[in-house]
């Protein structure tokens, strides 16, 4: 999912947000949230789907919708509004395939706007290892940005890009009692290498999320009496970067995304600011909101298990 620069796709594929949508979904969430029962557990730790970086779980997922606004640097600078989706399905135990797409509205300064789909992306992920006692997980996989599947009006590439990636997650529930209030902390992250079939530069795509789970604090450390909606929230900060490695690719670009996730049994709503790390990335703060539907809890007959085999 590339738009003019690899950085744009890194920001836009994650989640796409407007405060009005966020407020509406939070109002629906108030109908009664419970502890999340969807995918993403290692031991007692629930790792939520993150927005700017991918989580390490090969499970059934439906991200719909994902909305964002960000103004990237350039001559001219371009304001991008993005509506996206992602669907992943576990095929074999611990192995999932996915597809994602984005519909873009681009408005360069002083020029007419253009709209259209960016290139669609296929993904594969395999959970290679996990340790429940130490709340740790490691996965391998990658993405295939399918060149020629998007609109040239929004700068979709005609060439393919393959990005082999490693994914990791670590919760800190194994810390000693003297550090018990640090146990709700967890980190997830990814490291990938772009391999374009064109003359575009190779990029190191890397990022991580640092989160503090209030549901984990309440259930696994100490019930401090938080009420809804706070007891269902996970504050986090995400860091997402793209570092060109050759072919005069320029400087590293990226964003820092502080925000919060709200967990219920059937869905997650997340909202983050998009803060550029340098002038090469952009000069204005953007916003993103994303709705993740836990389809394995809504339709357990159809989702939450592999098509072939049994992961119990």
Where on the chain are the PLM-derived regions?
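Transmembrane beta-barrel domains of Gram-negative outer membranes and organellar outer membranes
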Residues: 37-312
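Cleavable N-terminal export/targeting peptides
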Residues: 1-41, 298-312
